Amino acid sequence: MKRIFGIFIFLSLLLFLVPLLASCTKEKQVYIVYFGEHKGDKAFHEIEAHHHSYLQSVKETEEDATSSLLYRRASSINGFAAELTPDQASRLKELKEVVSVFKSDPRKYKIHTTRSWEFVGLKEEEGEDYRSDGDAPRHKYDVNDRFRVGRKFLKNAKHGDGVIVGLIDSGVWPESRSFDDKGMGPIPESWKGICQTGVAFNSSHCNRKIIGARYYARGYERYYGPFNAEANKDFLSPRDADGHGSHTASTAVGRRVDGVSALGGIAMGTASGGASLARLAVYKACWAVPNKEKYATNTCFDEDMLAAFDDAIADGVNVISISIGTVEPHTYLEDGIAIGALHAVKRDIVVAASAGNDGPARETLSNPAPWIITVGASSLDRFFVGRLELGDGYVFESDSLTTLKMDNYAPLVYAPDVVVPGVSRNDAMLCLPNALSPDHVRGKVVLCLRGYGSGSTIGKGLEVKRAGGVGMILANSRDNDAFDVESHFVPTALVFSSTVDRILDYIYNTYEPVAFIKPAETVLYRNQPEDSVYPFSSRAPNWVDANILKPDIIAPGLNILAAWSGADSASKDSIDRRVLDYNLDSGTSMSCPHVAGAIALLKSMHPTWSSAAIRSALMTTASMTNEDNEPIQDYDGSPANPFALGSRHFRPTKAASPGLVYDASYQSYLLYCCSVGLTNLDPTFKCPSRIPPGYNLNYPSISIPYLSGTVTVTRTVTCVGRTGNSTSVYVFNAQPPNGVLVKAEPNVLVFDKIGQKKRFNIIFTTQRYEFTGEARRDRYRFGWFSWTDGHHVVRSSIAVSLV
């Protein structure tokens, strides 16, 4: 009887679940349907009709087809975005001419979140000596000479005047002084864009600096529902409510603004973009997630970003900067940024994108497509330092932005020891809201742990303040991880986890432990490596195709001072009410616009250079050493390798005259795509019967996975600069990876005119090598090769793994 009853229950559940499962398979989601490149034989309205016919072929009614459509792109990008069931998407994928169909996902992308331009040699006015207490600068060369070279470069590049930089991000705060158009000339005649109005944004917010602005929210609203200003904490317009877009825009092309600083006067100085006279076109495609804290999350949809790319191309931008990337790896045909960038590059628009903030783990980088300039993050020679002093005389130098002062030494306690009754010690250890007992915290310094997913660091400081504390020591969860250095509400010292043991030992073995936290100071040339790769910067190998070495380059991304949104606080935390005009932020999001600004300058100097030529110039002239002429270090003090820094740290002034460039056309990228199985991107291009390997794309670096025996790699260089009227003779040199013999045929290249091309082979051969420890067979090893004529050094990174 029990068995019969069990069968009855099972059948009942089955009958209930079958319709439910069936309904799930019919659930609509937004998909992007991509057709590759246009054939060129259809008018705009014919392309739209063509798209509609495909959509209607899987829809039951005309009304359903029309209502499901979000975007229909026909100017540069060939495709549409629509609500589809999984079955409808699958049917479309099988149709002729459809290149890819992929699902939109709000969790797919995330935003990758002064002194920095001086650091790379671009300073407009006469520079200071940067001497401290009369001591000579510790650099091994004349800093002012570097600034003179930088000023000449800026003058020759006309500060980017005439170049239009498109920024796909969270919008712009147009009232910022960084976007003032005073003294700027007429808008370039090549500009075809618009100034789209919306909430708190009208046509008067565009000017001769912000020459255009648009916003894209159809994908966002289709997923989250109609826009609700209170829940969304955003503006349905190009106006920036986050700060990220304004920050990246002003870093790339902001005007020179004197006397700016972060909260408390930290980083006081001049804020300026790299190309201060370049024009800005804003494409807002990223938004706050409803009812979520801005510091914790944001979202950008494929369909919205592809629409932004399509408009930017049609509007006439010269450069696109996009500090956004996927959370998880995706193939090129499932990555809206890769697709949009390929169409941009076809029209010689240079695209720079951030590498991501998921380092230091391997295979974490975003934007790995070879037609994108992928930018990692380095530190600066400027630090914000506070001092933590314990009662036993022990002193810690601490990262800090807090300028608040303690009156004197105060009792020191560990957060779990001052917990509110009934609250877990873990919550107290993380200094979560209402976890600390005012009776035991009042007048004391509290040691808290940072944790992950445990609330904002600003919130921890507020909890200490709520409980009456006078200072906070915030310890990281693991050594060498990056700190978000923020301006807290109580005097705060940030320490690594290795320091915690020393502090706890003092607390528990001292009768009355005390601590004193000194306010933060701005320090230049601190006694630690500058120009190093920061731990959050994402790393190779390139999981989409290991034949392409990424990132391409690194640029400053730590504590960058730039414009901010007046609708957001310093920390992006809703409990933080402090509003400011300029803010410090860190991430590869900040590195990317540095390179975008440099690209704008190079575009101004060399308007006929292709996107690939500009990338090559930046990569092959990058610096191998830091300011002390020592190899650039990784976050842990070890020498950084190309998986972390690509071709190393960018030097815009050197990139202006690279000598030789590795050029690549749109056709070159299509041929490369054949090697990764993408054979139908362009109906006018057919893959050859013998497809060359991916490492033969004419790229300024070389990556060979699984080298066995001998591999020959082919490259072509183009002469873009000569010394005088004489013939230029370039000689090959190499530092080969361990266990690999590297030689070039020919090993001398002779050029007698600008524009001349020379082809050469580089032959890689494995040698007898003992693989032990870190040099196991599955490990990559690194090197470089160069061509030099005595004036130019054209250097390329090498990454090889042996089998």
Swiss-Prot record:
Residues 23-112 form a propeptide. Its EC number is 3.4.21.-. GO terms for molecular function: serine-type endopeptidase activity. The keyword Hydrolase applies. It is found in: Secreted. Gene3D superfamilies: 2.60.40.2310, 3.50.30.30, Peptidase S8 propeptide/proteinase inhibitor I9 (3.30.70.80), Peptidase S8/S53 domain (3.40.50.200). GO terms for cellular component: extracellular region. The active site is at D169 (charge relay system), H244 (charge relay system), S589 (charge relay system). One of its GO terms (biological process) is proteolysis. Residues 1-22 form the signal peptide. Glycans are attached at N202, N725. InterPro entries: PA_domain (IPR003137), Peptidase_S8/S53_dom (IPR000209), Peptidase_S8/S53_dom_sf (IPR036852), Peptidase_S8_Ser-AS (IPR023828), Peptidase_S8_subtilisin-rel (IPR015500), Peptidases_S8_3 (IPR034197), S8pro/Inhibitor_I9 (IPR010259), S8pro/Inhibitor_I9_sf (IPR037045). The keyword S-adenosyl-L-methionine does not apply. Keywords: Autocatalytic cleavage, Glycoprotein, Hydrolase, Protease, Secreted, Serine protease, Signal, Zymogen. PROSITE patterns: SUBTILASE, SUBTILASE_SER. It comes from the Eukaryota. Residues 409-504 form the PA domain. Residues 30-108 form the Inhibitor I9 domain. Residues 140-656 form the Peptidase S8 domain. Belongs to the peptidase S8 family. This is Subtilisin-like protease SBT5.5.
